[in-house]
C-alpha cells in the first residue's frame, strides 16, 4: 500500500470487521488468528495499513495483507500513539504471532473488511450529521417562527417516502 496510514480508528474498524468475518468459521483459518486479533484489539495495537491499495470486488487484498503481516509478527503497528516494529510490541506484550498453515494465507487476506470497517465509520458519522442537521433545521424553524405544517403528520402521511416521514416525525418530536 501507499499513501498515508489509516487512522487508528479506521484500522481498528478493519480489524473488527475482519474478526467478525473470520469468527464465522468459513474462511479456513485456525482459531489462533481469532485469538490474536482479539488480543490486538483489546490491547489497542493497530496495524500500519496504508490508505491506498486494491479495494474492490475481489477484496481488499493490499490492506488485508498489511493486517496479515502483523498477525505473523512482521511489519509495523501503532501502539501507544507510536509507530513501532511489530516484533518489539509483541515481545513487550508477550504475544505470539500466528503460524500460517496450508491454504490459510488466502483466508487471511481475501475479503472486504477494509471497505466494511471504513463504511461502518462513515455510516456512524453520517447518522450523526443527519441528527445535527435535523436539530439545526428545527432550531431555524423556531428562530424564524416558520409554520410547521411542512412536517405535519397529515401532509407527510400522504407521501410514500419512508425516510421523509421518519424525519418529519423526528422534527415534530423535537419541537
Region roles according to the model:
Residues 1-175:
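Conserved, well-structured ligand/cofactor-binding cores
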